Amino acid sequence: MANYITIAIIVGIVCGQALSVEDVDRNLLELNLPYGRGLDSELQLARLMLAAPRFCHPKRNSELINSLLGLPKNMHNAGK
């Protein structure tokens, strides 16, 4: 029984740390500020560039359409 309690405590600590990492990213990007506010300064741009790369991988519209339709890139280029 003591082992189950120890495992539950360890899992709780690990989950708590994972959630705090997301909060750090959110505070780093200042995403909790009101909408409509752009990158007003170089400091905000630097914070955006230092953030985790998962926020910085935009896809073009053609890449999104091809991924949804399952078309290979060569087939899309041949149609141009």
Curated annotation (Swiss-Prot):
Subcellular location: Secreted
MF-aspect GO terms: hormone activity
InterPro entries named in the record: Pigment_DH
GO cellular component, one term: extracellular region
Residues that bear Alanine amide: 78
Pro-peptide positions on chain: 21-58
Pfam families per UniProt: Pigment_DH
Keyword terms: Amidation, Cleavage on pair of basic residues, Neuropeptide, Secreted, Signal
Signal peptide bounds: 1-20
Keyword Ribonucleoprotein annotated: no
GO biological process: neuropeptide signaling pathway; response to light stimulus
Primary location group: secreted
Keyword Secreted attached: yes
Tissue expression notes: Expressed in the brain (at protein level).
Protein function: Neuropeptide PDF is the main transmitter regulating circadian locomotor rhythms.
Family, similarity comment: Belongs to the arthropod PDH family.
Protein name as catalogued: Pigment-dispersing hormone peptides
Organism encoding this protein: Camponotus floridanus
High-level lineage: Eukaryota, Metazoa, Ecdysozoa, Arthropoda, Hexapoda
